[in-house]
Each structure stands twice: as C-alpha cells, then as structure tokens.
C-alpha cells in the first residue's frame, strides 16, 4: 500500500491528477496531437494550441459523443453581425508527408451559412497562425490547403474545398476548388458525426501521386488520387462520376520543402441575420500519420 500512496503524493506535488493520466495528449501510436477538452479551464485547453480566435465565443459543453471517455466538448458560438465564429489552430513546424485528422462534430443550428470548416494544409515556412491567402493560387512552394466542408450551403453535404498548384480559377482570383462524392453525404443537425480526412503529399515532387480522402462515421466517402476515381468537372467544380474520366491526381508541391504543417479547427461564419446565433460542438480530436477511425463504443 505504501507504493501507491507514495505515487499519489508525487502526483499531488507535481500538480498531476487522474484526468491528466486518463486523457493523455499522446496516448495512441503515431499520434501527433490530441485534444479532448477535458482540462479544468479553457485557458488550459488553449495552451495545447498554437493560435486561437474569439475565445469569448468558446465554452465547454457537457454533450459528448457516444464512446467518448470524457465529459466535456467544446462549443463555438457565432452571433451574426457581431463576430466571425471562432477557431483553434495547431502548427506542426517539423512538417509531415501525410496527415490524418479525426474529429467529432455536432451541428446544433443552421440559421446562417457556414463559410469554412476544418482544414489540413502546409505553409513554407511554417507559421503558428493562419495566413491570409484566400483568393491566391499556390505556386507549389508556398502553401497548400484543403478543408472538409459544406461547399454548397443550400444542400448540406460533405465535400472538399481545396487550394493547390493546379487548381482552376480566373487570372485574378482563385477560390477553393470543390470535390464532391458521386452520392452526396448529407449532414444531420443535432447528431454527433465522426469525421476523418487525410492528405498525402506527392513524392517525387514532379509526380501527381498526391491524394486526399475523407470518411464519415468510419465509412470512406471519397478518395482522390492518381488515376482515381472517375471525375466530371467544370471549372473548379469536381464531382465523382462513373461516366467521367480518371482523376489526374494531386501535384501538391514542386519543392520538397513544402510539407503538411497545420491543422485548423475552424468555424468561420460571415453571413446571416444580425443577432441570430449559431452553435457547433467539437470533441475527441486526433492528428496522426495513419488512419485513426471512430471511437470504440
């Protein structure tokens, strides 16, 4: 009995509690980053991230996904005409060739259109905060970005919104290109959804063997790579189609120095009726070099 008591005394002296052990930030193999929002305060949560926006619009919720080992999730709140939602940003300055991001999300309301959601990407050089690059075409050396989003807010369904060196656009402005699965995956309100997506960089850099894919509740919905799937596209709008032509693949970069350096938990809102409130929940975030999958129930 003396050894357990001694261990507990050491934990108290070091300021460690049971939650810190149970909810370790790196408890899975190949896990680079983990966030379960189980800290005592939001300020402690923010220490796990590189950058944040609108902390007043964030709060804890007692609503958690089925299978979660925790008791709290993060709520982000948008007030139309007052703010632009909120975000948490994590930088990985060491850079990676492939990243998987899994998170749980619950849309509580749908009053205002969602401008942007969660993203993976890379800056060269890496930055500890989001850079203002909207409307710019990457040159293969400076940046790449892809978000798992709602590209068509009138029809709530999942898709990619992607910036890369061969994206389509006008000579003056390049907005993210949209990638959709052949069968739309609709997004329900008031339900926890397990979302996972990945980016694999092209190697060698002159090749088009880069990829991206996403899964909803553990089911792969769309996977894009060199020669697959068949795609129909018009301008910057790409849709999986059995009657299309094989997708060329992604040349994400032409310089090996450009790597994946960021995860952006984004709830970016810009429209809506002034004063109306929208809210979203996030929980159980994991960033890894390999597929993660849903929580075990």
Per-region residue spans from a language model:
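Beta-strand acidic-aromatic groove motif in beta-rich domains, primarily in extracellular
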Residues: 86-87, 111-133, 206-211
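Extracellular carbohydrate-recognition regions
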Residues: 20-52, 297
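Flexible glycan-contacting loops in extracellular carbohydrate-active proteins
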Residues: 225-280
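Secreted extracellular polysaccharide-interacting domains
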Residues: 74-102, 128, 133, 170-182
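Extracellular glycan-recognition surfaces and repeat-rich motifs
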Residues: 43-73
């Amino acid at each position: 009995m003396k050894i357990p008591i001694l261990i507990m005394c050491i934990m108290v002296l070091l300021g460690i509690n049971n939650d810190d052990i149970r909810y370790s930030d790196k408890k899975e193999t190949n896990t680079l980053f983990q966030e379960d929002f189980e800290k005592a305060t939001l300020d402690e949560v923010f220490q796990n991230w590189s950058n944040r926006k609108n902390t007043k619009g964030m709060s804890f919720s007692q609503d958690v996904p089925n299978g979660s080992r925790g008791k709290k999730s993060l709520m982000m709140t948008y007030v139309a005409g007052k703010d632009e939602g909120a975000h948490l940003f994590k930088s990985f300055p060491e850079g990676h060739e492939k990243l998987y991001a899994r998170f749980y999300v619950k849309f509580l309301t749908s009053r205002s259109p969602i401008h942007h959601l969660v993203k993976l990407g890379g800056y060269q050089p890496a930055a500890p905060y989001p850079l203002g690059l909207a409307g710019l075409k990457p040159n293969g050396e400076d940046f790449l970005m892809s978000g798992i989003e709602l590209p068509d807010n009138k029809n709530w369904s999942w898709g990619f919104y992607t910036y890369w060196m061969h994206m389509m656009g006008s000579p003056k402005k390049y907005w993210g290109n949209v990638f959709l699965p052949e069968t739309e995956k609709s997004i329900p309100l008031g339900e926890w959804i397990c979302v996972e997506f990945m980016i694999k960089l092209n190697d060698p850099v002159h090749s088009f063997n880069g990829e991206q894919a996403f899964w909803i509740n553990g089911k792969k919905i769309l996977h894009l790579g060199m020669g697959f799937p068949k795609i129909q596209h018009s301008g910057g709008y790409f849709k999986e189609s059995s009657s299309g032509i094989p997708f060329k693949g992604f040349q994400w970069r032409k310089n090996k120095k450009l790597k994946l350096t960021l995860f952006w938990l984004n709830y970016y809102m810009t429209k809506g009726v002034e004063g109306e409130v929208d809210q979203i929940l996030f929980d159980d975030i994991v960033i890894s070099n390999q597929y993660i999958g849903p929580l075990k129930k």
